[in-house]
């Protein structure tokens, strides 16, 4: 499939979506063995159910799949009164995706809840993503400013 994709200049991506594909370690290992430049992953925040009895850790799974990511899917189901997704800690997830792995591409939105309309669920997810993005940006800028101030202090006092 990747050979055909290569000829057409199309990436072939695999989403964790139940069964073995929801085992992040297994899927990452499979993608590593394929070792084709057109083969990648679409880590989905909410698809880590291996079977009826086994759930794979979503944060570990996304972490394992991000080196192969060609896109990211922010799946949501339900929100609390503060607008936080109750099944996935979006702050923790985006720290992994954006912070640790440096993702700068698109983040798709999937709403699969039943309490909001599809449109309202998508909007609630977008609002949450934008809020977390702004918080992460502010945190990064504060860290850069602190590093800059520390560096300036060293430069001023460095000759003593």
Model-derived regions: residue spans:
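Histidine/acidic residue-rich metal-binding segments in metalloenzymes
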Residues: 2
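Histidine-acidic metal/acid-base catalytic patches
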Residues: 7-9, 20-160
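Structural motif
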Residues: 15-17
């Amino acid at each position: 499939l990747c050979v055909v994709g290569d000829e057409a200049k199309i990436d072939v991506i695999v989403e964790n979506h139940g069964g073995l594909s929801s085992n992040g370690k297994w899927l990452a290992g499979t993608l590593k063995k394929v070792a084709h430049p057109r083969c990648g992953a679409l880590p989905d925040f909410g698809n880590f159910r291996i079977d009826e009895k086994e759930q794979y850790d979503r944060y570990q799974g996304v972490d394992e799949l991000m080196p192969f990511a060609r896109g990211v899917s922010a799946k949501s189901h339900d929100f609390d009164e503060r607008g936080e997704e109750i099944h996935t800690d979006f702050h923790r997830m985006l720290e992994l995706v954006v912070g640790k792995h440096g993702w700068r591409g698109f983040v798709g939105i999937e709403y699969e809840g039943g309490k909001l309309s599809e449109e309202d669920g998508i909007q609630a997810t977008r609002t949450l993503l934008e809020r977390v993005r702004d918080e992460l940006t502010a945190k990064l800028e504060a860290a850069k400013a602190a590093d800059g101030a520390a560096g300036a202090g060293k430069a001023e006092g460095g000759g003593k």
